[in-house]
């Protein structure tokens, strides 16, 4: 059935399904430069909705938007040894401009800790200048070798938050506060269940003291890191000499954080909820929540379209995102298929017989149709959209629970990571972690904050667990 509609079934080739649905649902296309994509209006509308939600939450927590340069002197990156080592393989570097070789090469922004640190060293003098709570919406460039639309692209859009604090305690509180905002976005807006946790030393952000993350499980059993929040300690403060005088007139280094979420979150939405018929979009982030498809012959055209327009206005008045598909060149069947492919949560079918009965047919993207009084639709749909969100979340959570296993032997571990999350003890040794990755392609995703304390022995080498609880392992994007 899926193939008739032009999509490879997920069970046959999930990766191919993903690439096809992005193009056929008109989310994005490939750019002329390898590893770049063109985000089409429908895909960009999802990103705009994500932006609006996050921007509101950032401002509610006292953050302000700012913008820093795209070009960063290479000497800035070299100031923090771990940072430059972590990003060097992915850097795009400008060596010539205006027809001449530059005195100093410029990195095209891979992330902005260094340039913001430089500016803070100019702006921060006293405890009165703290905290600094900044966010930047922009693009970054990381020259990825293996690219995939939304998940890994050479250039991508994201937000990166950067904050500076007087104490470690304040900075660590900020790290968790921002991670919880990402978790809220995932659960309450994208209907994606996520695990909040701590990255291992091997997997942390280059230059961080530690990294926290939200991890989601996709329908092919692979994990996706959907957002990260880092405690940078005094690392960048020392590199860029960001000092302040505290209330006791002592000169100290600030404690900084950074946190980011990119358009790979769109990839998470696609792979958590999509099916063989196409996208299934969570209503709170969907560009179109309800599509109205009028069904008519020539003699009833005017009457049906007039009623459809009236319904559209009534739904817009409820604050819903509505589209009326009044294209004459396509059949209703073609339109049904197209809007299913594009993942619109609800479709209203309205024909002359429906009008006579003062009713309309409401079809859900999750399956099923019902006939409702036309006048009742504007009142009924907001509640139905909420129920749609809850059902999406329930299904995703059930999938995750069905594909999560506690394992205590390496054989069981190897089996578990073929289909989802493996919860296992680990010794904390980077070399052991690397061997697990080489032997199984699975990586540590996080040490979950919510997991019960539990003692045990490393699933691979048998040494005592370093974390006092099980670690989440999975193959990952």
UniProtKB/Swiss-Prot annotation:
Homodimer. Only one tRNA molecule binds per dimer. InterPro entries: aa-tRNA-synt_IIb, aa-tRNA-synth_II, aa-tRNA-synth_II/BPL/LPL, Anticodon-bd, Anticodon-bd_dom_sf, Pro-tRNA-ligase_IIa, Pro-tRNA-ligase_IIa_arc-type, Pro-tRNA_ligase_II_C. Catalyzes the attachment of proline to tRNA(Pro) in a two-step reaction: proline is first activated by ATP to form Pro-AMP and then transferred to the acceptor end of tRNA(Pro). Can inadvertently accommodate and process cysteine. Transmembrane segments: none annotated. This is Proline--tRNA ligase. The keyword Secreted does not apply. SMART domains: ProRS-C_1. Residues 340-369 are annotated as: Interaction with tRNA. Belongs to the class-II aminoacyl-tRNA synthetase family. ProS type 3 subfamily. One of its GO terms (biological process) is prolyl-tRNA aminoacylation. GO terms for cellular component: aminoacyl-tRNA synthetase multienzyme complex; cytoplasm. Pfam families: HGTP_anticodon, ProRS-C_1, tRNA-synt_2b. It comes from the Bacteria. It catalyses: tRNA(Pro) + L-proline + ATP = L-prolyl-tRNA(Pro) + AMP + diphosphate. Keywords: Aminoacyl-tRNA synthetase, ATP-binding, Cytoplasm, Ligase, Metal-binding, Nucleotide-binding, Protein biosynthesis, Zinc. Zn(2+) binds at residues 427, 432, 458, 461. Consists of three domains: the N-terminal catalytic domain, the anticodon-binding domain and the C-terminal extension. The C-terminal extension binds a zinc ion, which probably plays a non-essential structural role in stabilizing the fold of C-terminal domain. Its EC number is 6.1.1.15.
